[in-house]
């Protein structure tokens, strides 16, 4: 794992996400089913996910910060020496609704980290029932060459694991989420190969989606880019309800590949989704 100096080494990752903060919301993919369930015929639908701003964002952030789940995770972060950032840009909030799916999620960024590249607390609530459905404290670690290596996740007491793909426990109680570093590095080192023939802006319907195939990958990639890479992977996966592997990767690893390609294209669209899924080996 890479030692973080909180200046130059961290800035590359943060700057990349800031560049994509606004273009992500202008993604060209139509909204539709985005949550991936375990079976091909069972898709959780998160329609028209959107980021909140202004009063809506502040109100939701204050509400979720009062929950026991947030307080427990914040206490854990403070025990690690980290602090919750207080500036407005350090909070990301979003909302998604669909058939049998409704979720509002807030990401609270942390600072004063020891060896992680970045960290955040993510809290997600069902606005209809008030139930907390997502509650994570995630520390993102990178390799010496700046590639996402693994994520150490803490959850509230008695919480169920939400993205435990190839996971293991650490001595401090964190769940280590493997993100397939080699696949991410290969994606970051690949050259853009734009195929401009027969572009299509139409999103597949749930009946068209093969959960393990190219269509599912491109659809998920489009929704990730629509949310935007200013947010951490834990926020994006929580908002969209993606809880199983996409393209054989954990959701966190998949998000990293999509954001790498979106950064190279400086935006979103069919070409980004196609290129990301090509690099993931599904298209």
UniProtKB/Swiss-Prot annotation:
Changing residue 71 to A: No effect on immunity function of Immunity protein HalI and interaction with Halocin-C8. InterPro entries: Hac8-like_N (IPR055022), Halocin_C8_dom (IPR031033), TAT_signal (IPR006311). Residues 1-40 form the signal peptide. Keywords: Antibiotic, Antimicrobial, Bacteriocin, Cell membrane, Membrane, Secreted, Signal. Predicted to be exported by the Tat system. The position of the signal peptide cleavage has not been experimentally proven. Immunity protein HalI interacts with Halocin-C8; the interaction is direct. One of its GO terms (cellular component) is extracellular region. The helix-loop-helix (HLH) region is essential for immunity function of Immunity protein HalI and interaction with Halocin-C8. Residues 61-75 are annotated as: Helix-loop-helix (HLH) region. The keyword Repeat does not apply. It comes from Halobacterium sp. (strain AS7092). It comes from the Archaea. This is Pre-protein-C8. One of its GO terms (biological process) is killing of cells of another organism.
């Amino acid at each position: 794992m890479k030692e973080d100096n909180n200046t130059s080494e961290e800035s590359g990752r943060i700057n990349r996400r800031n560049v994509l903060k606004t273009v992500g919301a202008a993604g060209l993919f139509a909204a539709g089913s985005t949550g991936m369930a375990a079976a091909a015929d069972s898709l959780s639908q998160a329609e028209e996910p959107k980021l909140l701003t202004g009063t809506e964002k502040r109100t939701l952030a204050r509400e979720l910060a009062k929950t026991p789940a947030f307080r427990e995770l914040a206490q854990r972060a403070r025990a690690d020496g980290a602090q919750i950032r207080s500036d407005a840009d350090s909070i990301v909030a979003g909302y998604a609704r669909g058939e049998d799916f409704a979720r509002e999620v807030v990401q609270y960024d942390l600072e004063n980290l020891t060896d992680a590249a970045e960290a955040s607390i993510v809290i997600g609530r069902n606005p209809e029932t008030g139930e907390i459905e997502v509650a994570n404290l995630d520390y993102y670690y990178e390799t010496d060459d700046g590639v996402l290596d693994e994520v150490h996740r803490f959850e509230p007491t008695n919480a169920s694991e939400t993205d435990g793909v190839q996971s293991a426990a650490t001595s401090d109680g964190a769940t280590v989420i493997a993100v397939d570093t080699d696949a991410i590095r290969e994606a970051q080192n690949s050259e853009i190969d734009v195929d401009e023939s027969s572009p299509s802006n139409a999103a597949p319907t749930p009946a068209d989606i093969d959960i393990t195939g190219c269509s599912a990958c491109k659809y998920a990639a489009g929704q990730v880019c629509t949310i935007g890479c200013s947010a951490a992977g834990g926020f994006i996966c929580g908002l969209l309800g993606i809880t199983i592997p996409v393209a054989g990767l954990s959701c966190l690893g998949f998000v990293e590949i999509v954001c790498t390609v979106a950064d190279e294209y400086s935006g979103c669209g069919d070409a980004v989704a196609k290129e990301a899924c090509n690099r993931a080996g599904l298209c």
